[in-house]
Amino acid sequence: MPVGAKLIGVGAGIPSAVVTNADLEKFIETSDEWIASRTGIRERRIASEEETTSALAILAAKDAIAFAQIEPSTIDLIIVATSTPDNLYPSTACMVQAAIGAPRAAAFDLEAACTGIIYALAVGQQFVGSGTFKTVLVIGVDIHSRFLNWEDRNTCILFGDGAGAFILQAADGENEILATYLRADGTGAHLLHIPNTGTAYPHAGTTPPKAMDRFLQMNGRAIYEFAVHAVPEAVRATAAKAGIRVEDIDFLVPHQANRRIINAAAERLNMRKEQIVSNVDELGNTSAASIPLALWQAIRRKQVQPPAICCLVGFGGGLTWGAAIVKWTAKDKRGDYNAED
């Protein structure tokens, strides 16, 4: 008999350095008005040399563990969704496992670009639902600033660095992860990619690639058209799987790519402004981290209060997209803790 699953914790790991649009004006031809009007982004966090992918993931993990007030030693599985690991191996998940003190946890990384956290959540739910594991730590983390051309105003203005985490646990009562939905279309792989970072690089193993050869590349118009169709499709399909109506969803927590995509998708779903969870203005596009970071902040600011039906929906390179509808009932067991204090 399938076991129900619920989310019992959420956490964040955010770099300390804030880069505002005014800061970007100093070295590229842009302005705060130009960036904000097109993306909704006002500032983003950028990782220092010491703030690695694993370091941010560890911060998010510890924050989620504190939220749920569980012992790290009780975690059975750690899944890290990232496109920007510290190294090809060992996995970031193994580094997290050692740092938080979870010696019995299995650990692996998963790569599905900005949709990675949704894929990881779905995989974690399957392990819990099958009875294989009871407690699963899922982390989305990316440091895209290492792969940006800081002279290209079409890409460098969009991204920030960060990590967000969820803790799933077997549910004694009803299943609170109501449905998940995953999709991919590899014919669009060329629309958003970071080249020359793997074995396809012609001189892999002999000559390191030049920095210019491994910058993130994106067809912004094509990604916009893809996203504004993919998000409503995923939300409707996931709601149907969950046996609810779109109108029954209390909050939409979308991938924080940019404000235009979020607003266009919300309009197609006939959702009100107050139903949309967004922090893209403060953190930019943090890739696999953006959904848990947005929900984490909305909970801290009391926009989302339990119980609430939330639809988490992501899209990104691959192309990949997907959604999860969850009933959020967890409360921060630290009381009125503020992670920014």
Sequence positions of predicted segments:
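Condensing-enzyme catalytic core mediating Claisen C-C bond formation in acyl metabolism
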Residues: 1-49, 152-225, 229, 233, ...
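Buried hydrophobic positions in well-ordered alpha/beta secondary-structure cores of metabolic enzymes
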Residues: 7-9, 35, 64, 78, ...
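Short beta-strand segments
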Residues: 8-11, 81, 111, 136-142, ...
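Conserved catalytic cysteine-centered active-site region
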Residues: 34-55, 82-136, 141, 266-295
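Phosphate/pyrophosphate-binding loops at sites that engage ATP/ADP/AMP, CoA/4′-phosphopantetheine
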Residues: 60-76, 233-250, 298-303
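Flexible, glycine-rich active-site loops centered on histidine and acidic residues
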Residues: 129-163
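Active-site pocket-lining segment
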Residues: 214, 227-232, 246-269
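Catalytic phosphate/nucleotide-handling subdomain of diverse soluble enzymes
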Residues: 293-313, 319-339
